[in-house]
């Protein structure tokens, strides 16, 4: 899908049967979720963001469904203010940031001496003329 940025890009994700809302965050390296129980082993990790550093549990090879697309990757679980899907999973989804096509550049044209540009037929005008 194409998502505009007039609102936060929040999507529904499914992690181990648990439905959550998460923010698609191209500025985040990692995916961080809170209040979620994941099976398997985890490793402790510290991550830093604008709000400082937080301690998280790192789970590898986690299956997540994002907007109906299944991906497998590393998920960090900890006290994040908002669940974020970082670049580690966005790249697997094939997400890209696209900028609109820039305005068409004009090319200056040199006219032959004595020419004052192209002649354009005048459209029919009403009484004002």
What annotation goes with each model-predicted range?
Residues 1-2, 10, 104, 124:
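A detector of low-complexity, intrinsically disordered, Ser/Thr/Gly/Pro/Ala-rich segments
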Residues 2, 11-12, 53, 64:
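Residues embedded in well-ordered secondary-structure elements
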Residues 8-20:
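A short acidic-Thr-Gly-centered motif at the start of a beta-strand
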Residues 18-22, 26-127:
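Aspartic protease core domain of the pepsin/retropepsin superfamily
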């Amino acid at each position: 899908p194409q998502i505009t940025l007039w609102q936060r890009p929040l999507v529904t994700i499914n992690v181990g049967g648990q439905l959550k809302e998460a923010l698609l965050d191209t500025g985040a390296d990692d995916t961080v979720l809170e209040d979620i129980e994941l099976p398997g082993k985890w490793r402790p990790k510290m991550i830093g963001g604008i709000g400082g550093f937080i301690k998280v549990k790192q789970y590898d090879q986690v299956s997540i469904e994002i907007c109906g697309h299944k991906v497998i990757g590393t998920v960090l679980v900890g006290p994040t203010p908002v669940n974020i899907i970082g670049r580690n999973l966005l790249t697997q989804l094939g997400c890209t940031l696209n900028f609109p096509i820039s305005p068409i550049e004009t090319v200056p044209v040199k006219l032959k001496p004595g020419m004052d540009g192209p002649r354009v037929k005048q459209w029919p005008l009403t009484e004002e003329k």
